[in-house]
Swiss-Prot record:
GO terms for cellular component: chloroplast. It comes from Medicago sativa. This is Ribulose bisphosphate carboxylase small subunit, chloroplastic. GO terms for biological process: photorespiration; reductive pentose-phosphate cycle. The basic functional RuBisCO is composed of a large chain homodimer in a 'head-to-tail' conformation. In form I RuBisCO this homodimer is arranged in a barrel-like tetramer with the small subunits forming a tetrameric 'cap' on each end of the 'barrel'. The lineage of its organism: Eukaryota, Viridiplantae, Streptophyta, Embryophyta, Tracheophyta.
């Protein structure tokens, strides 16, 4: 057995305690051992989360028989009043309203581009020119009515284009065919 002097042990102990005092311990992450563990199994999903009252679960998107369209597609079809408010919003933001229509597929599909992501390969046809001078939602809704009259069995969407950043900022379906 090797003998170690008590002076060497004291030096090691002093260095260890001095080093521990120089650096504050990291307290950002906590050990999971500090969390309470529930021993009983609870199959009632409403008790998992709480907003101060009883949580009611709601199905957000039906998994069968409903195609995904654009922004707001999870809502029922927008009324004329709701469409006017959306158009007023995009005009207020300084975006240029534009109408586009699609005769066959108004939902997400990949035909011209196969990689995942925002771009899904759809090309819509522009209805007339963008409404550069539009100051009121009624002007856009009149164009929407004209497009509906010309192509009643088409998908029609309203987009808001930011000509400074050169990006499309908003897009939503304003009209769907009767069979959708």
């Amino acid at each position: 057995m090797a003998l170690i002097s008590s002076a060497a042990v004291t030096t090691v102990n002093r260095a260890s305690s001095a080093q521990a005092n120089l650096v504050a311990p990291f307290t950002g992450l906590k050990s999971s051992a500090g969390f309470p563990v529930t021993k009983k199994t609870n199959n009632d999903i409403t008790s998992i989360a709480s907003n101060g009252g009883r949580v009611n679960c709601m199905q957000v998107w039906p998994p069968v028989g409903k195609k995904k369209f654009e922004t707001l597609s999870y809502l029922p079809p927008l009324t004329e009043e709701q469409l006017a408010k959306e158009v007023e919003y995009l005009i207020r933001k300084g975006w240029i309203p534009c109408l586009e229509f699609e005769l066959e597929k108004g939902f997400v599909y990949r035909e011209n581009h196969r990689s995942p992501g925002y771009y899904d390969g759809r090309y819509w046809t522009m209805w007339r020119l963008p409404l550069f001078g539009a100051t009121d939602s009624s002007q856009v809704l009149k164009e929407l009515a004209d497009c509906k009259a010309e192509y009643p069995d088409s998908f029609i969407r309203i987009i808001g284009f930011d000509n400074v950043r050169q990006v499309q900022c908003i897009s939503f379906i304003a009209h769907t065919p009767k069979n959708y």
